[in-house]
């Protein structure tokens, strides 16, 4: 796992289009330290346990998050689920998974990711989820279709901003994970839950500790 943040940082800094005083590059000392850390480790590196995750997301506003959490308790009881619901402040739609590593993300990487995300131009938009269902990995989620086009557009633009070689749209199924449970639930319609997406958030998650830190917030254009 070790080194994913490093390679991501190297990739971002090799990409064209951000030259100038706003572009921050890793220090030579930082680069040498990373080379020493990952050079010649072989199987040892593979055995390291990932502790830190970075991902870009869209979050519901606090009022909507509280509403989702309240509904989750009812859906959990109605479907006989036993998994622990996510905290309201942890509810989100993942846009792009940056990576997992065995150390906290360096400031240089956070800065580079923030700069790339800031290059995404898109107005605030409304999202609406109208069903619940089981998803991969035992997740019980909010899902939708027709009213999630804005998330598809934002995810593609953000992916292009982060990718040295923008290409066709990646597979992306917008959803909000509510809890995890081994019992699978077929798709069920619900009264729609909606909010206005106003910003992109870069989240630093401490794996296994249920700790999320919003390290960067990039506002979308306001109408």
Question: What annotation goes with each model-predicted range?
Answer:
Residues 2-223:
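Histidine-dependent nucleotide/RNA phosphoesterase domain, centered on the 2H-phosphoesterase fold
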């Amino acid at each position: 796992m070790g080194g994913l943040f490093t390679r991501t940082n190297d990739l971002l800094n090799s990409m064209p289009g951000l030259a100038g005083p706003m572009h921050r590059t890793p220090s030579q000392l930082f680069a040498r330290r990373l080379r020493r850390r990952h050079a010649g480790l072989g199987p040892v590196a593979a055995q390291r346990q990932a502790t830190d995750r970075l991902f870009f997301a869209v979050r519901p506003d606090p009022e909507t998050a509280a509403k989702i959490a309240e509904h989750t308790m009812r859906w959990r009881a109605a479907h006989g689920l036993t998994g622990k619901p996510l905290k309201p402040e942890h509810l989100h739609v993942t846009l792009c998974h940056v990576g997992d590593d065995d150390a906290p993300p360096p400031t240089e990487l956070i800065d580079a990711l923030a700069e790339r995300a800031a290059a995404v131009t898109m107005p605030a938009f409304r999202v609406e989820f109208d069903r619940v269902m089981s998803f991969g990995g035992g997740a019980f989620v909010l899902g939708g279709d027709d009213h999630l086009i804005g998330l598809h557009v934002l995810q593609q633009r953000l992916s292009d901003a982060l990718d040295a070689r923008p290409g066709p749209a990646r597979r992306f199924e917008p959803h909000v994970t509510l809890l995890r449970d081994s019992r699978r639930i077929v798709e069920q319609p619900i009264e729609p839950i909606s909010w206005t997406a106003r910003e992109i958030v870069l989240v630093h998650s401490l794996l296994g500790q249920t700790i999320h830190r919003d390290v960067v917030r990039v506002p979308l254009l306001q109408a």
